Amino acid sequence: MSEIISKSNSFKKIPFYYFFLLLCLFDVNTSMQSNNEKNYDIQLPQLDDNNISIDGYLDEEVWKNAKTVSGFTNYLPVDGAKAEDDAEVYIWYSTDAIYFGVVAYANKDEVRSTLADRDKLNSDDYFLFVLDTYNDQRTAYAFAVNPIGQQYDGTITDNVPDRKASKPYTIDKNPDYVYDSKGRITEKGFEIEIKIPLKSLRFNNNSTQKWGFNVLRKVQHSRYWTSLIPLKLGEASFLAQNGKLSNIKNLKSNRLFDINPELRGAMSRMQEDKDFSSQTQDPLGVNMRYGLSNNTVLNASLNPDFSQIEADVAQISYEPRRALYFPEKRPFFLDGIEFFSTPTRLIYTRKIVNPVASSKITGKIGDKNSIGVISAADNFGPSISKMDVAAVNALRLKRDFLDQNHAGIVYTDKTYNDYSNRVFAIDGKIILKNKYSFQGQGGFSVTNNADNAGKPAPMWNLSANSSNRDWSHSFTSTAFHSEFNPALGFISIGDYVSVAAGTRRTFYGSKGNAVEKFTMGYRHTYNWSYDPFINGEQPLDWRSYPTFSFNFRGGWGLSTFIWYESFGFSEKSYQNHFYKDGEEYKPFVDRDAIINLGFMTTLQLPQLDSFSGSIKYGYGKDPNYQEWAPGMIELIEMKLYWNPSDQLRVNFRLNQQKNKRPTDETLVSSGTVPRLKVEYQLTKSLFLRFVGQYNSSYRDSLFDTSRDGLPIYFKNSDGTYIRAEKNESNNIQADFLFSYRPTPGTLVFIGYGSELSDPERYRFQSMQRQSDGLFIKMSYVYRL
């Protein structure tokens, strides 16, 4: 009994207002009904598509018999009012495709449209069609088209209403689907025409289909989102509010079967080389997709090209204790990636680095069960003939029940010689009255190697949320044991427990007011290492974040959050730090906590005729992590987008962070990353791109300010010590790409990339080439 009381003391350290905020989860007015009080059930006609051409003109006879729907209403940033610019949406289907036509009304001079590459409609007006083909209100297809027919597609899922979510939904635009679209600007606005082949969709095997459906419209000059089916803010689910497409039947069962051979070549040279040398030992590869049913797909690949054609955007870590996350970009893993999503990233396919062979099954089994399975041989060797492989597997199963609720399991394993790692977890989600959501995941990992037999290392991830149009409340807790290690997953920080609660209040301005919406919130977090939490010890860190945000008429936005924190010293993070006392090297121990106070402000610019962007600035007290001492931090983030013509796109990003010693204002560390991307769209499928990135990193010689400024030393693996001297690197990366991609999977890429170093920041006088290379990739999709 005394042990139980001891362990429960960790919860006594949590302030009482945490439990007050938790109770607030249930004080939301539950008298509000679901948004769709009307029955938005659209009965679709089935028509003959033999004589239709997708050309942006809705002049064929068949469009006169289509179902017509209109009456758009505002959704973001303020919901409810009738949209200033309405549109008529025409819908029908044939036995092997579904068709949409739009007649959009707008001031011709305010229509924003460019010859954008796929998925790059950020500066354009566009219509986004949401198709929940399983009608399960969990994941849906997103097909978007701008006024001249350029495309943007992906999958759409709900966001839990919290301070991090800028929209009630998330669109993963990495998956690409085959569909036809054309559009044209008219005197009254614009018209678009779309054909989505049923081969591009997954749906159940029922003889009569009912799909979830909505149409969103992005109006760039006002930055408003409008919706065809009226939507309300503050609901626990975006997808649950959508309407239905009914009476879909007599569909052809066209089995998906794609074969995608690819050919690639690469040459490179290092700093000491004059000539290029071939880097391609296995130039041929093949990918295959086969529809096991209408809603289950088998993917297989042999010697695929899993390289990326654009380098990751360099990131600067605000908190060095946390790992940086980079999204997946490789098409094989992106197809059906929604079937592997879990509350915690226990399946992170970028951990599968160079698979020589892989297979994947994703889809639905019946109406309630979904499955995702990946098996791969990850090759650490230089070629197929000299393979050194690890076997990796990932399994995700999920069972739906009671509308939007589900339960699921995750299993992954990786084996390589004497090493093995296995992860198992269960999870579930419950949504009640479309106001309350509860989500949880718990599991463990076991890691074995030649020297140690591992023990189960637990983890958990819990959240509870409630929301309505005016209020939202949240409670979360996440924990990872010190030995929890998902070999195929991603966690930003291990040996970690977090307990947090927050609340948010939103106010809405009257029509015509300068301020359309004002939101204020507060969030408080406590963090521990895992064992101290279990043992009932005091938190290592606490953090308080008041937040304020404004949406102004015309598309302007302003948000600010204040950080007030206490960070405790973690000896584990500084095991390699020593100071020299006489002839003795002594470790970093018993350091005081650091109190932080500062602010971060973001200004969102409106979408002007050809220009938009955002600027973020932060300043205040923050840890000097390099020396574990108080520091003064200054942060700048800038994103600027300029479209001087319909074909030219210029994107500029700047990330800069400086940390100074407050005593003498000397610079401890800094990171600066300007990045310029210029794209010229020659045709709908053909573009040229240049990306230039300058990554400057500086760290001063380190001193132990708590020990009279004694020098800091690092301990080498051989037991010797080295002075932490000044360190500086300035790397330049320049990439050029010719891209031809008429349809997803069929493409020609020709590229050149170079990496250079600059001895002094921004001098550009003594730059030295570190490496450069050429590559070509060609692939073609045979759709059988």
Where in this protein do the model-derived segments appear?
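Outer-envelope beta-barrel architecture signal
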Residues: D96-I98, T139, F190, S207-W211, ...
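Exposed, low-structure sequence patches enriched in small/polar residues
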Residues: N354, T362, G443-L784
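Structural preference for beta-rich elements and adjacent junctions enriched in aromatics
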Residues: M32-D400, G408, D418
